[in-house]
Amino acid sequence: MKMRDTFLKPMHPEGRKFVGIFAAITVILFLIWSVLGWIGVGLTVWCYYFFRDPERVTPAREGLIVSPADGIVSMIEKSVPPAELGMPDQALTRISVFMSVFNCHVNRAPIAGRIAAIAYRPGKFFNASLDKASADNERNSLCIEMADGRQIAVVQIAGLVARRIVCFSSTGDTLRTGERFGLIRFGSRLDVYLPEGVEPMVDLGQTMIAGETVLADLQ
């Protein structure tokens, strides 16, 4: 029952064409050799699983910053937000969440607020778990401004396998905490830059659930 429930989660619309392509190839493989066909079935099921989009229960209390992605906390360090966002040139606490190809890759807003800026920058495709991925890899950055004027930066970073960053939101949009705003296909990383003076409430290696796990408390 538990395994069935895991694989029968709703699929994000971004995954439909990929599942369709895998399914079409599977039919062709069955015509060639049944063994190849069953391998295709397995890959099609995996593709469906990759693009799963389960509902999440986001904490209701205001001031809680939640994880924007499923995965593992790979880094916690001081760093300056991406220059293209136009935020102050000041080192802030950066929490990096690494997503493997087995994690759900739908990205969610870490806090409620208005998107003050979105900036895409092309780049390399180093392993997203490496520190240099923040500076060198393809990325899409968002600056979310909260009601009190403080800002949080969220950065979608492409990885070794991921070659497509998707962002559903636009500058000026208002997001709720835990609301879907994008995804990255096939392995990647999300960086969150906390406001000055806000301390992280997570540890290295800790498992994150997007929209649920609390990263920090503004209060």
UniProtKB/Swiss-Prot annotation:
This is Phosphatidylserine decarboxylase proenzyme. Its EC number is 4.1.1.65. One of its GO terms (molecular function) is phosphatidylserine decarboxylase activity. The active site is at S188 (schiff-base intermediate with substrate). Its main location: membrane. It catalyses: a 1,2-diacyl-sn-glycero-3-phospho-L-serine + H(+) = a 1,2-diacyl-sn-glycero-3-phosphoethanolamine + CO2. Signal peptide: none annotated. Is synthesized initially as an inactive proenzyme. Formation of the active enzyme involves a self-maturation process in which the active site pyruvoyl group is generated from an internal serine residue via an autocatalytic post-translational modification. Two non-identical subunits are generated from the proenzyme in this reaction, and the pyruvate is formed at the N-terminus of the alpha chain, which is derived from the carboxyl end of the proenzyme. It comes from Ruegeria pomeroyi (strain ATCC 700808 / DSM 15171 / DSS-3) (Silicibacter pomeroyi). The keyword Lipid biosynthesis applies. Keywords: Cell membrane, Decarboxylase, Lipid biosynthesis, Lipid metabolism, Lyase, Membrane, Phospholipid biosynthesis, Phospholipid metabolism, Plasmid, Pyruvate, Zymogen. GO terms for biological process: phosphatidylethanolamine biosynthetic process. Catalyzes the formation of phosphatidylethanolamine (PtdEtn) from phosphatidylserine (PtdSer). Heterodimer of a large membrane-associated beta subunit and a small pyruvoyl-containing alpha subunit. The gene is psd. Binds 1 pyruvoyl group covalently per subunit. The modification Pyruvic acid (Ser) is found at S188. The keyword Ion transport does not apply. The record marks G187, S188 as: Cleavage (non-hydrolytic). It is an enzyme of class 4 (lyase). Its cofactor is pyruvate. It is a peripheral membrane protein. It is found in: Cell membrane. One of its GO terms (cellular component) is plasma membrane. Pfam families: PS_Dcarbxylase. Belongs to the phosphatidylserine decarboxylase family. PSD-A subfamily. Pathway: Phospholipid metabolism; phosphatidylethanolamine biosynthesis; phosphatidylethanolamine from CDP-diacylglycerol: step 2/2.
